[in-house]
């Protein structure tokens, strides 16, 4: 399951997480099955959070590079 989660896109993981939450909210699953689905949901949540953090870090880096490039351009004009 862990390898499968790493290969999933963020959107796929989110869709699967939503499905698990819906199944758990129905409340008609046996305890063992509910626990298994809950564990899967937690793993997907962590994986998705990591993907979001990586995306945020990439955006921050790109914006910093752009700002740095703009600062250098402004310095050359003066």
Curated annotation (Swiss-Prot):
Listed EC numbers: 3.1.11.6
Compartments, record wording: Cytoplasm
Cytoplasm recorded as keyword: yes
Keywords: Cytoplasm, Exonuclease, Hydrolase, Nuclease
InterPro entries in UniProt: Exonuc_VII_S, Exonuc_VII_ssu_sf
UniProt GO cellular component terms: cytosol; exodeoxyribonuclease VII complex
Predominant place of localization: cytoplasm
GO terms classed as biological process: DNA catabolic process
Domain of life of the native organism: Bacteria
Record Pfam families: Exonuc_VII_S (PF02609)
Reactions catalysed, as given in the entry: Exonucleolytic cleavage in either 5'- to 3'- or 3'- to 5'-direction to yield nucleoside 5'-phosphates
Coiled coil regions in record: none
Any one Gene Ontology molecular-function term assigned to this protein's record: exodeoxyribonuclease VII activity
Function of the protein: Bidirectionally degrades single-stranded DNA into large acid-insoluble oligonucleotides, which are then degraded further into small acid-soluble oligonucleotides.
Self-association and partners: Heterooligomer composed of large and small subunits.
Family that this chain belongs to: Belongs to the XseB family.
Protein name: Exodeoxyribonuclease 7 small subunit
């Amino acid at each position: 399951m862990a390898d499968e989660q790493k290969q999933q896109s963020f959107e796929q993981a989110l869709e699967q997480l939503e499905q698990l939450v819906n199944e758990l909210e129905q409340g008609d699953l046996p305890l063992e099955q509910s626990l298994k689905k809950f564990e899967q949901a937690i793993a997907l949540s962590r994986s998705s959070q990591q993907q979001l953090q990586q995306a945020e870090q990439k955006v921050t880096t790109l914006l910093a590079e752009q700002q740095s490039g703009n600062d250098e351009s402004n310095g050359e004009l003066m």
